[in-house]
């Protein structure tokens, strides 16, 4: 066991995590030269295109060190984005060490810090590495200062490398072997294996990626999940080198996969502990929690007959993404669809993109909302994730909204504009620290404000230099109201929004004005109103299209003209009673684009 090293790589987006992983796999000879491709471990198309890692992957590699010994290195690739922070913490708790990759030209950024703190809390040895030192803009001294300043770990002897050219990659591996401790654990003890990730394979069912902490696992053993109590016979065990390779057994300290003929992904939850049925472990490994969705949105098919296809697509996606939740819902305006829960905005975009790309769906998405805690006047508490389910104002005692703690990092030139943005978003400043040229701001901001367009606005006010990460803090009482949109006196449920009272009038006016531009003119007047409860806060009118009925009427008596006009008026009135206004798809997106002034 002294020759095993389990490690993962922590980095901000675009600091070269996947490229470094590619190089390490190449140096260790994990794949032949013809099988190498960029970002070997990112298996989804979206991961490649966006250059992000979503699911954790592993590679078991053997490396002959300069001291002549052969070491088994287990690389566990982690996602770097805040939406997937639970997956990151599970991947990290399976390691003894982590390579902290920092772009020498950019310095430390928000997600690096967030994941690095997670690693330090879990007691993982962090080994700093400066990447991209071949760039003319690289400034390694500055980056080292920032690492020591912001994160507070000693980085004087940080290894320097360039993952693109392969320069210094072996030094990184040597530093890893020297600094990271070998795994502890007893191969003879009762089995405890941590599920790092799980995904669905069309041929063998669910594949679980595990780190064996104690004990030994062989095919034909009976295992059980400690969170659910379900039992399964093991069919295969093995490792990925990144290709899968079956082994006779997996024992303490190793990272590999288990295939046990499990049919649904919900049975193999990330963070759960696997143990033997015959000789079970007394307690599960710490840190398991159910992941709760933070952001909700309605997904509807554009064609009503696509509903079943959408349901099948969601079921298939759910096989590979246990954190996605959905339930059927009906909207008067959009017909049948699903209310889906996501971990965050990036997660939502990815699910939408995968539905459109892999399953060829045409979707309408409603505005994303967060979950509110509503205390009703009879004392009961309900969770509202859909504006349409918000009780009437008279039945609400108080509404609590989710507050998140946001950490922002930016060069000091942009502090002013970022603070202004946070203030607009009803944020309250908790802390502000200067680290050399970088500034760290900590704010508490309502999650609802972040969901809309905070990230895009942050990037635009800071010219792309600011980076952020956020985590849920608590529910806090707040004065939020539901704004309904009425078209000719009828509520359109899919257009309801929940906003803070201070912005409700303004948002109502803006949405009404937007709708006026978007809804085509009808044969009769259309009134668009925004209402809070029974109180109308804004109104816009769309004038009717009308035919000039007097065109053929020359001279003669005025009563002749009056008669024609009256007749037209009657017709319009009748039309208005039976007609319904078609609301185009853009109207639902318009709500998203209403800027907060």
From Swiss-Prot:
Record-level GO cellular component terms: plasma membrane
Protein transport among keywords: no
Domain tr-type G: residue ranges: 2-184
Molecular function in Gene Ontology: GTP binding; GTPase activity; guanosine tetraphosphate binding; ribosome binding; translation elongation factor activity
HAMAP family given in the database record: LepA
Reported function: Required for accurate and efficient protein synthesis under certain stress conditions. May act as a fidelity factor of the translation reaction, by catalyzing a one-codon backward translocation of tRNAs on improperly translocated ribosomes. Back-translocation proceeds from a post-translocation (POST) complex to a pre-translocation (PRE) complex, thus giving elongation factor G a second chance to translocate the tRNAs correctly. Binds to ribosomes in a GTP-dependent manner.
Protein name per UniProt: Elongation factor 4
Organism: Burkholderia vietnamiensis (strain G4 / LMG 22486)
């Amino acid at each position: 066991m002294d020759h095993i090293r389990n490690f993962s790589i922590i980095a901000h987006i675009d600091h070269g995590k996947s490229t470094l992983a590619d190089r390490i796999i190449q140096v260790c000879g994990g794949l032949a030269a013809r099988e190498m491709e960029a970002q070997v471990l990112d298996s989804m198309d979206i991961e490649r295109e966006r250059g992000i890692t979503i699911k954790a992957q592993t590679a078991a590699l053997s490396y002959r060190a300069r001291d002549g010994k052969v070491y088994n290195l287990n690389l566990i690739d982690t996602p770097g984005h805040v939406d997937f922070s639970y997956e990151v913490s599970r991947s990290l708790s399976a390691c003894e060490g982590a390579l902290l990759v920092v772009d020498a030209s950019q310095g430390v950024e928000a997600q690096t810090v967030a994941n690095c703190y997670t690693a330090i809390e879990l007691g993982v040895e962090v080994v700093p590495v400066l990447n991209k030192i071949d760039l003319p803009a690289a400034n390694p001294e500055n980056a080292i200062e920032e690492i020591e300043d912001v994160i507070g770990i000693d980085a004087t002897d940080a290894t320097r490398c360039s993952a693109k050219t392969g320069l210094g990659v072996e030094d990184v591996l040597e530093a890893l072997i020297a600094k990271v401790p070998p795994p502890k654990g007893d191969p003879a003890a009762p089995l405890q294996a941590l599920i790092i990730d799980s995904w669905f394979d069309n041929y063998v069912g669910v594949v679980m990626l595990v780190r064996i902490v104690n004990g030994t696992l062989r095919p034909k053993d009976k295992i059980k999940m400690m969170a659910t109590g379900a039992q399964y016979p093991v069919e295969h065990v093995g490792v990925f080198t990144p290709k899968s390779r079956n082994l006779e057994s997996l024992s303490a300290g190793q990272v590999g996969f288990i295939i046990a003929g499990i049919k649904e992904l919900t049975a193999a939850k990330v963070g759960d502990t696997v143990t033997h049925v015959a000789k079970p472990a007394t307690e599960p490994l710490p840190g398991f929690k159910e992941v709760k969705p933070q952001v909700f949105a309605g997904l509807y098919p554009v064609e009503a007959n696509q509903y079943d296809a959408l349901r099948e697509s969601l079921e298939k996606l759910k096989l590979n993404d246990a954190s996605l939740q959905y339930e059927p819902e009906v909207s008067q305006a959009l017909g049948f669809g699903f209310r889906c829960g996501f971990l965050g905005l990036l997660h939502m975009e990815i699910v939408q993109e995968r539905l459109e790309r892999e399953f060829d769906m045409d979707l309408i998405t409603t505005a994303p909302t967060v979950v509110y805690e509503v205390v009703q006047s009879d004392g009961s508490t309900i969770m509202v994730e859909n504006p349409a389910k918000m009780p009437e104002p008279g039945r609400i005692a108080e509404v609590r909204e989710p507050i998140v703690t946001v950490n922002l990092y930016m060069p000091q030139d942009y502090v002013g504009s970022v603070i202004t943005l946070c203030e607009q978003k009803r944020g309250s400043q908790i802390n502000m620290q200067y680290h050399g040229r970088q500034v760290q701001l900590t704010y508490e901001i309502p999650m609802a404000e972040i969901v809309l367009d905070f990230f895009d606005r942050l990037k635009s006010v800071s010219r792309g230099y600011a980076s952020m990460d956020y985590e849920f803090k608590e529910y806090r009482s707040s004065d939020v109201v539901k704004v309904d949109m009425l078209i000719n006196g009828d509520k359109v449920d899919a257009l309801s929004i929940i906003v803070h009272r201070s912005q409700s009038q303004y948002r109502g006016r803006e949405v009404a004005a937007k709708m006026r531009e978007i809804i085509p003119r009808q044969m009769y007047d259309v009134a668009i109103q925004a209402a809070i409860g029974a109180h109308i806060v804004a109104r816009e009118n769309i004038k009717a299209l009308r035919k000039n009925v007097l065109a053929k009427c020359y001279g003669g008596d005025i009563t002749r003209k009056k008669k024609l006009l009256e007749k037209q008026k009657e017709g319009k009135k009748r039309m208005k009673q039976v007609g319904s206004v078609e609301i185009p798809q853009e109207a639902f997106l318009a709500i998203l684009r209403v800027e907060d002034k």
